[in-house]
């Protein structure tokens, strides 16, 4: 029977998992792309996608729900001001997980997680001068 197999435990306590995914969700919303291990990225989708769906409808109740889950005021403001309206016409599938090889030290599978349709980052003059 498959009872109790609803999520990946990732060898962490429930409070550690909650804090880790809260931090990762804030990082993803703030930077719109993060690098992490593949199992963490796959599990993070289950946290971030419902938050972006909340961000599409900026009611006070939705803002309070998002703040209760993220505990970061700047991330909630960005979620409702930028990210929610960007995905107003999209029904789910807001994130993309790209495999990027294995980590050098322990050979863990790594992944690059990003928001789809995110604006392209313009190269600065400092980057051009370095080349």
From Swiss-Prot:
InterPro entries: Ribosomal_bL17, Ribosomal_bL17_CS, Ribosomal_bL17_sf
Native organism taxonomy: Bacteria, Pseudomonadati, Pseudomonadota, Betaproteobacteria, Burkholderiales
Source organism: Bordetella petrii (strain ATCC BAA-461 / DSM 12804 / CCUG 43448)
Biological process (GO), any one: translation
A Gene Ontology term for the protein's cellular component: cytosolic large ribosomal subunit
Keywords of the record: Ribonucleoprotein, Ribosomal protein
Gene3D superfamilies reported in the protein's UniProt record: Ribosomal protein L17
Pfam families per the UniProt record, alphabetical: Ribosomal_L17
Membership in a protein family: Belongs to the bacterial ribosomal protein bL17 family.
GO MF term (any one): structural constituent of ribosome
Signal peptide segment: none
Subunit annotation: Part of the 50S ribosomal subunit. Contacts protein L32.
Domain of life: Bacteria
Record-given protein name: Large ribosomal subunit protein bL17
């Amino acid at each position: 029977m498959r009872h109790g197999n609803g999520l990946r435990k990732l060898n962490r306590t429930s409070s550690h998992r909650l804090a880790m995914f809260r931090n990762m969700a804030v990082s993803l919303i703030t930077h719109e792309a993060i690098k992490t291990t593949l199992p963490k990225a796959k599990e993070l989708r289950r946290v971030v996608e419902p938050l972006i769906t909340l961000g599409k409808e900026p009611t006070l109740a939705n803002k309070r729900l998002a703040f209760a889950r993220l505990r970061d005021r700047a991330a909630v403001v960005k979620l409702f001001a930028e990210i929610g309206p960007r995905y107003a016409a999209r029904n789910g599938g807001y994130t993309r997980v790209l495999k990027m090889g294995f980590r050098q030290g322990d050979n863990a599978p790594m992944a690059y997680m990003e928001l789809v349709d995110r604006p392209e980052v313009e190269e600065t003059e400092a980057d051009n001068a370095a080349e």
